[in-house]
Amino acid sequence: MKMLRDPLFWLIALFVALIFWLPYSQPLFAALFPQLPRPVYQQESFAALALAHFWLVGISSLFAVIIGTGAGIAVTRPWGAEFRPLVETIAAVGQTFPPVAVLAIAVPVIGFGLQPAIIALILYGVLPVLQATLAGLGAIDASVTEVAKGMGMSRGQRVRKVELPLAAPVILAGVRTSVIINIGTATIASTVGASTLGTPIIIGLSGFNTAYVIQGALLVALAAIIADRLFERLVQALSQHAK
């Protein structure tokens, strides 16, 4: 009964219901858009598009987390502090560089498909994770690390057992931002041949089919909201655990 009162449960249920209902929604969209000969996207199943979309976001976000967290840890060490401005600048440039431009540059070199899309999403996903890692590690009281040092912990042990657990809620908030950005940005990966929930949107825009755009946009928006709520729960759980 508690699950039935959870908004997150109903959001997930709505997403799954839309995935399986949209292929049979022709009467509704035909009534809304009578001028369209094919008002429902049927080239691929929405379930397959959703799985491909989540896989692309998951892989790119994983690399973004590894790179962003690793770089954040490195430049907060004494031996890497001088590289902090450079790392922050590179990450900021990657965030401001349009993903469409990244795809346009990568396609002639790598070809069509997932690879250029993954590169673009990694560039977009690194900055929030890096900034959160720097903020989380920077907020740790120096006395805490000194106590850990006095207990005989090595540098690696202090990072793994003290600093990262304390900074985890802040880092996870950055990961949350990164993943949500990538869920939306992954839609343009369909322009280079990757199957995502953006495929109906891109085809709809190019073919002036508003119904396709609505169908894809509904699923992408719901996926972003669900991811946001899931990470909100994780951040709350980690914050309570840290206390």
UniProtKB/Swiss-Prot annotation:
Describe what upregulates or represses it: Expression is sigma S-dependent. Induced by both osmotic shock and entry into stationary phase.
Q: How would you summarize the oligomeric state and partners of this protein?
A: The complex is composed of two ATP-binding proteins (YehX), two transmembrane proteins (YehW and YehY) and a solute-binding protein (YehZ).
Q: What is this protein called?
A: Glycine betaine uptake system permease protein YehW
Q: What gene makes this protein?
A: yehW
Keyword Cell membrane listed? The answer is: yes
Q: What does this protein do?
A: Part of an ABC transporter complex involved in low-affinity glycine betaine uptake. Probably responsible for the translocation of the substrate across the membrane.
Gene Ontology cellular-component annotations: ATP-binding cassette (ABC) transporter complex, substrate-binding subunit-containing; membrane; plasma membrane
Membrane topology recorded in Swiss-Prot or TrEMBL: Multi-pass membrane protein
Q: Where in the cell is it found?
A: Cell inner membrane
